[in-house]
């Protein structure tokens, strides 16, 4: 599948990452030498993508409603790794645009409607990222529950999620299994880098997540890793990666 642009925006500003602190904050030196504090939406360890002294891109939004006028959006990887999307608020928007453009129809079937943040789960205390309504011509008319995970960690050509223990992520897998068989359950790792060729669970970071990942696949949860490439003014859908059941192969 040729790459397809799914999102375009005002060009981001380039700078050099000085440090990240208090999880939510990063300090960036812009091209003109100005030091700014940028919001960091990714509260995890950012394994493999946190490189002080490396080039980053930030979005400038001086709205008076915002505490910080800058948001850290992308990080350049050493060597030929390209750019990685680090803003965890972006994947849901990316996947919605990709689905509504019909780019995932070979995996999901034709879709008539998309709803976001719908309450579901065993105790009705969880929210699914996207709930899809199949189009009338779809062979399978069951609703489709979609859980999206931003994936930035890699080892060689393997994209990995998670990069730390995530009890929340474990719960999401259990909730996806719970909707079966009355609905379809789909896990979409949003692979926010273009230098990898496969996806696997990060067993070394969270062994329990890896166990649940394999249980979910065996129970009927579908895994559709969607790969994206990042430019200063756009994001492109690069296709769906094959799934590897374990980190070690």
Curated annotation (Swiss-Prot):
Pfam families: SfsA, SfsA_N. Coiled coil: none annotated. CDD domains: SfsA-like_bacterial. Signal peptide: none annotated. Disulfide bonds: none annotated. It comes from the Bacteria. GO terms for molecular function: DNA binding. HAMAP family: SfsA (MF_00095). NCBIfam families: sfsA (TIGR00230). Belongs to the SfsA family. This is Sugar fermentation stimulation protein homolog. It comes from Synechococcus sp. (strain RCC307).
């Amino acid at each position: 599948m040729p790459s397809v642009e799914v999102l375009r925006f005002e060009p981001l500003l380039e700078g050099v990452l000085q440090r990240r602190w208090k999880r939510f904050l990063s300090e960036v030196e812009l091209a003109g030498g100005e030091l700014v504090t940028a919001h960091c939406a990714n509260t995890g360890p950012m394994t493999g993508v946190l490189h002080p002294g490396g080039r980053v891109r930030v979005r400038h939004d001086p709205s008076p409603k915002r505490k910080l006028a800058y948001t850290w959006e992308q990080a350049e990887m050493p060597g030929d790794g390209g750019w990685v999307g680090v803003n965890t608020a972006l994947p849901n928007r990316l996947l919605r645009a990709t689905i509504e453009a019909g780019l995932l129809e070979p995996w999901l079937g034709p879709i008539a409607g998309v709803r976001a943040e719908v309450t579901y789960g065993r105790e009705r205390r969880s929210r699914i990222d996207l709930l899809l309504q199949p189009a009338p011509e779809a062979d399978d008319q069951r609703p489709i529950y979609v859980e999206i995970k931003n994936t930035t960690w890699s080892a060689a050509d393997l994209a990995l999620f998670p990069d730390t223990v995530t009890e929340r992520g474990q719960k999401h897998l259990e909730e996806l299994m719970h909707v079966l068989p009355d609905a379809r359950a789909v896990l979409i790792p949003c692979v926010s880098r273009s230098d990898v060729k496969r996806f696997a669970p990060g067993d070394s970071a969270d062994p329990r997540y890896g166990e649940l990942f394999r249980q979910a696949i065996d129970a009927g949860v579908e895994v559709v890793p969607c790969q994206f490439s990042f430019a200063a003014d756009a994001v492109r859908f690069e296709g769906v990666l094959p799934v590897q059941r374990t980190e070690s192969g």
